[in-house]
């Protein structure tokens, strides 16, 4: 069998969820959208269900997958519904629903429902993606109550720059939210992963840890609470070929690496079809046989090359770690000019093995 695998440590996942609770004293929705950021939504939900206050996903399809797997905990639809016909399913499966636009509010008012909805009313506090304008927020809240179709309303917003610890934008968003919710008697939810780790002043009865659940930092700089996270995924494979090259020889497509010295090259069963970033440059760190080395040459669809010159013990069959507990996903992402969210979500072909059940 091809040796490319993703090892998922469910005990680390639980540790990170508990950390979100510990840091905030709030209830926490585990964000497992996009197949739990490439970690497997159903398995992650089953691992957390005994202690999680609920889960959050992007859409009804993701929520119904959880329900089909027997997950009975609350599930919030972060994008809400896309057409009014979904409201019956939302009510039938006891899903919680974000309302971020006036058209959604109007759909709730007009659609007959056999049971009331749990609604999270989203404010656009400055990100300008989705969310109600502050001038419409009070009226939308009152209309939801008057509709008789909601059992509870939670007030929420989403931070645009909470991963920038010195940015004023997050404080400004908090101020906009606080002004908009004046006089509204409801729980609130503001803090995503960077909000949980770095913005203790942000109010939140509910928090929404996403990236931090999987043990990756949302920050580009060192941060004390993020240092307590435990990586959940280890992306690994094995060396499948070794060759010795003299100085001056090219490696891989486009000859993007030319050996500056006699070089021992290992080829590994991992490529961009597995989700490893094609744009990762020469020098991107990897771990082989327990020792750090680096990527050389362009990443191919199914294979890539690494420098084994200073790892003489490495040979065919030696284990390779691309990210995990020793090479952090955030470090690889930074080399590749992207973010850990993306490299996790891109893992489509690699089989997952679970430990820490």
Curated annotation (Swiss-Prot):
Family matches, as SUPFAM superfamilies: Alanine racemase C-terminal domain-like, PLP-binding barrel
InterPro entries given in the database record: Ala_racemase, Ala_racemase/Decarboxylase_C, Ala_racemase_C, Ala_racemase_N, Ala_racemase_pyridoxalP-BS, PLP-binding_barrel
EC code: 5.1.1.1
Pathway entry: Amino-acid biosynthesis; D-alanine biosynthesis; D-alanine from L-alanine: step 1/1
Catalytic activity, as annotated: L-alanine = D-alanine
Alphabetic keyword roster: Isomerase, Pyridoxal phosphate
Active site: 33, 253
CDD domains, per database record: PLPDE_III_AR_proteobact (cd06827)
GO CC, any one term: cytosol
BP-aspect Gene Ontology terms: D-alanine biosynthetic process
Residues bearing PTM N6-(pyridoxal phosphate)lysine: 33
Pfam families: Ala_racemase_C (PF00842), Ala_racemase_N (PF01168)
GO molecular function, one term: pyridoxal phosphate binding
Cofactor: pyridoxal 5'-phosphate
Binding-site residues, substrate: 129, 301
Function: Isomerizes L-alanine to D-alanine which is then likely oxidized to pyruvate by DadA. Shows racemase activity with both alanine stereoisomers, negligible activity with D-cysteine and L-serine, and exhibits no activity with the remaining natural chiral amino acids.
PANTHER family: ALANINE RACEMASE, ALANINE RACEMASE, CATABOLIC-RELATED
Stated family: Belongs to the alanine racemase family.
Record protein name field: Alanine racemase, catabolic
């Amino acid at each position: 069998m091809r040796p490319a695998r993703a090892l998922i440590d469910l005990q680390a996942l639980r540790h990170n969820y508990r950390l979100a609770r510990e840091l905030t004293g709030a209830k926490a929705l585990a964000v497992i959208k996009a197949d739990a950021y490439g970690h497997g939504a159903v398995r992650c939900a089953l691992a957390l269900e005994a202690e999680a206050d609920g889960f959050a996903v992007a859409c009804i399809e993701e929520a119904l997958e959880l329900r089909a797997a027997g997950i009975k905990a609350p599930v919030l639809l972060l994008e809400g519904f896309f057409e009014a016909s979904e409201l019956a399913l939302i009510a039938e499966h006891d899903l919680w629903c974000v309302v971020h636009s006036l058209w959604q509010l109007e759909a709730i008012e007009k659609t007959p429902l056999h049971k009331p909805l749990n609604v999270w009313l989203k404010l656009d506090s400055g990100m300008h993606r989705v969310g109600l304008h502050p001038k419409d927020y009070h009226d939308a809240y009152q209309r939801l109550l008057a509709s008789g179709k909601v059992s509870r309303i939670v007030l929420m917003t989403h931070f645009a720059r909470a991963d920038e610890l010195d940015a004023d934008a997050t404080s400004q968003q908090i101020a906009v939210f606080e002004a908009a919710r004046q006089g509204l008697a409801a729980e609130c939810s503001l803090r995503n992963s960077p909000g949980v780790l770095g913005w203790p002043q942000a109010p939140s009865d509910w928090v929404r840890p996403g990236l931090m659940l999987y043990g990756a930092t949302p920050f580009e700089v060192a941060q004390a609470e993020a240092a307590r996270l435990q990586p959940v995924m280890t992306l690994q494979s094995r060396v499948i070929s070794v060759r010795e090259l003299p100085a001056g020889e090219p490696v891989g497509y486009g000859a993007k690496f030319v050996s500056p010295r006699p070089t021992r090259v290992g080829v590994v069963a991992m490529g961009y079809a597995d989700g490893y970033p094609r744009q990762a440059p020469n020098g991107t760190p990897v771990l082989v046989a327990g020792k750090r080395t680096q990527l050389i040459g362009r990443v191919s669809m199914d294979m890539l090359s690494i420098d084994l010159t200073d790892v003489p013990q490495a040979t065919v069959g030696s284990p390779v770690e691309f990210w995990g507990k020793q090479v952090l996903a955030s470090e690889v992402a930074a080399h590749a000019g992207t973010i850990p969210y993306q490299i996790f979500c891109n893992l489509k072909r690699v089989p997952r093995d679970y430990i820490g059940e």
